[in-house]
Curated annotation (Swiss-Prot):
It comes from the Viruses. HIV-1 lineages are divided in three main groups, M (for Major), O (for Outlier), and N (for New, or Non-M, Non-O). The vast majority of strains found worldwide belong to the group M. Group O seems to be endemic to and largely confined to Cameroon and neighboring countries in West Central Africa, where these viruses represent a small minority of HIV-1 strains. The group N is represented by a limited number of isolates from Cameroonian persons. The group M is further subdivided in 9 clades or subtypes (A to D, F to H, J and K). Homooligomer, may form homodimer. Interacts with p6-gag region of the Pr55 Gag precursor protein through a (Leu-X-X)4 motif near the C-terminus of the P6gag protein. Interacts with host UNG. May interact with host RAD23A/HHR23A. Interacts with host VPRBP/DCAF1, leading to hijack the CUL4A-RBX1-DDB1-DCAF1/VPRBP complex, mediating ubiquitination of host proteins such as TERT and ZGPAT and arrest of the cell cycle in G2 phase. This is Protein Vpr. The gene is vpr. Its main location: virion. Gene3D superfamilies: 6.10.210.10, VpR/VpX protein, C-terminal domain.
Amino acid sequence: MEQAPEDQGPQREPYNDWTLELLEELKNEAVRHFPRIWLHSLGQHIYETYGDTWTGVEALIRILQQLLFIHFRIGCRHSRIGIIQQRRTRNGASKS
């Protein structure tokens, strides 16, 4: 008969602690890339929609992750990650 493998991995933090730590890291990163008024408005929207609940925390984490992913994917001035098109001269040579 099959049995589930024993948990041999490292001990994990409690979910609530890990979630709050992740939210704090995302907020710190978001402040570096977006206007504070946008982030404040997002926080107000989440609070009005979900109140002070874990569902609201999870929604805020998900939205911040999506915003940062798209921001980096499009091209952030602070990052080398992204798809910013470089101008090219004839013969495909780039300006230096």
